[in-house]
């Protein structure tokens, strides 16, 4: 993502991103404006990135479904990005009422050039010159999240979670001193606080660890934004939109003498499983199954192929539950073409993942996971690993218990 970057300045420049929950109504918009004012009063320049208010994006999507059966992608991007344009205008009005001069910018005005992939556009370059001019004039730049303009001069939507990516890209392009992602939680925790009362907020975590966490179910920040931050060395501060307490810093792996073996346990109940039975054990059959899924942007995660028996095998994979219907349709067609026996689905599964940078140098982690789950009578259906993660598919009804016992086994409540 090439960009035109500005030189370092003596006054700190902070990028602050607030999501839809944080700007859901007029009172919260004024609270965010007050937060920005206080940040400036402490001697900082601020660029503010905001999402659409509350559930406005969902409401616009429902409205489109009521109006149209075809819903052309170009027009959907025009519609969806209207939510952010509304939010930035209202935010500037609130700031002006507090004697803070501010200018609003759409993604296009802020210099975001994207590809032509409507609904999920990728940033190609950023030239935030107009934003920089506003900063230099002593004003606050308020930028619409999750949008840009394509190479063929059409408005584009960056997809869900794109406001985080907008903020990180601006932090890189403007050479900002910090990029603060404000959410409805106070940082990154050792597990979901709604599941485990003993969940502990992490003071810091590495990009690699957070990427693994977001890939297996941690909802915030958006995975794309962490990827961009890691690629361009943008240090992140994930913190609460409703308090001034410090959150979690995300940076390159710290060069400490002894790193924690495990940083987090991540529960995920949004997964389903598809099994293709009686698959001919021939070259090319796996590609015939998974290429059509990739072409339709179906997000396949774990894949297991059984040992061949009499020239046939079974292949199982997991995918998000929201993509189960389209995934099943695609796989059923592929199964018929390759002569497989049939397709079955299971939406009663879940996943629990253990993540930690110290895992690579501690070979006993996997054994501890398996023993802990076995002692609780929790059956493991599938396993996948990376250098710093082990994920297990279990029954959805066992996800909470698995999370609690693994969090306890690795003593994550003790810090």
Residue ranges, per PLM feature:
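A conserved regulatory-domain signal marking ACT and ACT-like small-molecule sensing domains
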Residues: 247-415
